[in-house]
Regions:
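Residue-level detector of anion-binding/catalytic polar loops
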Residues: 51
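Bacterial N-terminal signal peptides that target proteins for export
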Residues: 1-8
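N-terminal signal peptide c-region/cleavage motif recognized by signal peptidases
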Residues: 15-19
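Local sequence-structure signature of Cys/Sec-based thiol-disulfide redox active-site neighborhoods
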Residues: 22-48
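Cleavable N-terminal signal peptides
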Residues: 8-10, 20
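Thiol/selenol-based redox catalytic cores and closely related redox-interacting motifs
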Residues: 66, 72-146
């Protein structure tokens, strides 16, 4: 009987999705009020264990600039998570890498609105290049390719 109980406990644990086992990661996402892909990105984050507070704003360029994201590297929206800026449709795996490594940067960005990225429609045409940004004006450097 004890063996059956242990087996049932193990199987029940495996049935729980992994994001549900971890504490949710709180994020604040600033987006253009008319943008629907940003809502898709927020839903993607929620499905992957984030709690997302979506804030419509008509001042995204300034929010990104204040966070250290150069104008030519801006993504579709700007998010803040655990002291970092995450600009654009950055995949969750790269955000988790950022939070685990805790590098001395302002954050990361996936410039533009690449097709096939989380929250965007279409198929992924090529790997996404995510850049690290700083507030000191240094040129962005490749942080991850996914």
């Amino acid at each position: 009987m004890n063996r059956m109980f242990r087996l049932a406990a193990v199987l029940a644990t495996l049935a729980v999705p992994l994001p549900a086992l971890a504490d949710p990661i709180a994020a604040t996402l600033y987006k253009n009020p008319q943008c629907s892909c940003c809502e898709g990105y927020a839903a993607y984050l929620r499905e992957n264990g984030f709690t997302v507070d979506v804030k419509p704003s008509n001042d995204l360029a300034q929010i990104s600039a204040d966070a250290g994201v150069p104008a030519d590297m801006e993504g579709c929206h700007t998010m803040f998570v655990d002291g970092y800026v995450v600009d654009g449709h950055v995949p969750v795996g790269v955000i988790r890498k950022l939070l685990a490594e805790r590098p001395q940067i302002a954050g990361i960005t996936l410039p533009g609105m690449p097709m096939g990225s989380p929250g965007m429609g279409g198929e992924k045409a090529k790997p996404f290049t995510i850049y690290a940004v700083t507030k000191d004006g240094a040129a962005p450097k490749v942080y991850a390719v996914e």
